[in-house]
Amino acid sequence: MRLDHLTLHAPDLSAQRAFYALTLGLPVCHDTPEAFTVQVGRSRLSFRQGHTPAAHFAVDIPRTLVTQAQAWLEARAPLLADPAGQVRFGPDGAFHSSNLYFRDPAGHIAEFIARHDLPFDHAGPFGSQHALHLSEFGLVVPDVTGAVDWLEARLGLRAWVGRSPTFTPVGGADGSLIVVPRGRGWFPIGLPGQPVPFHLTYRQGQVERHLTPADLPFLRPQGLT
C-alpha cells in the first residue's frame, strides 16, 4: 500500500500554509483560497478549509538522519513528549522505527518515522527534501475488529503487525492505515482519537484507489464527508 495523496481540513488555512510551506519548507504544488497542497517527497498532502478533530499521519524519513531530523524539527516546532518527558522514541517494537512527533496549527498530530528495516539511507544535512513520503494515516473507527475484517475482505488491505481491538495497522511497511477505536489516545500525548473527514488516494500494486469515510460502511453513521 502506497499513500499518494491525503486531504485533511484546517480552520486557518493561512496559518497552516505558512507552517508547511515556510516553516517546514515543503513545496506548494497547488494553492487556492479554499485549499492548498504541499509535496511530501513522492506524496502530496492537502488541506481544505474546515473545523475537524485532530488527525494523525506519519511521514517517512531516512533511517540515517534521525538525530539531524530531531535537531532540524526542534528548531521549527515543539516536539511532543510522553508523560516522562521523552521526545524521541525507538528504535524498538514491531515497527523497529525511530519516531518524532509534533502538531501543526490545526492540531493534527504529525510524525516523522525512520524505519530501520527499510533501506532509506541518505547523507545529511537533514532538510525538507528528506521527507520521503506519507506512510501512515490514523483511521479512527467504532469497532477495530469489524473495520479490519471489512478492509481485508473488501479492499485486500491486510493486518501486518498483529491484530488488536485497540491498534491494528493494515497495509504494509511502505504505507499503512493505523486502525484504532474512537477515544484511544494518540501517542505520545494521549489526545483521544476521533473520526475525521478525509480523502486518501493510495496505490495497491499498479492500481490507484480512493478512500473517503463515505466508502466505509463502518464510518457512515459518523456523518463524515
Kindly give the residue locations of the regions a language model identified:
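Glyoxalase I/VOC metalloenzyme domain signal
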Residues: M1-L3, H9-H30, Q39-P83, H96, ...
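Short loop/turn motifs at secondary-structure junctions and domain boundaries
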Residues: G90-F95
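A cross-kingdom feature marking solvent-exposed beta-strand/loop segments within repeated
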Residues: A84-F89
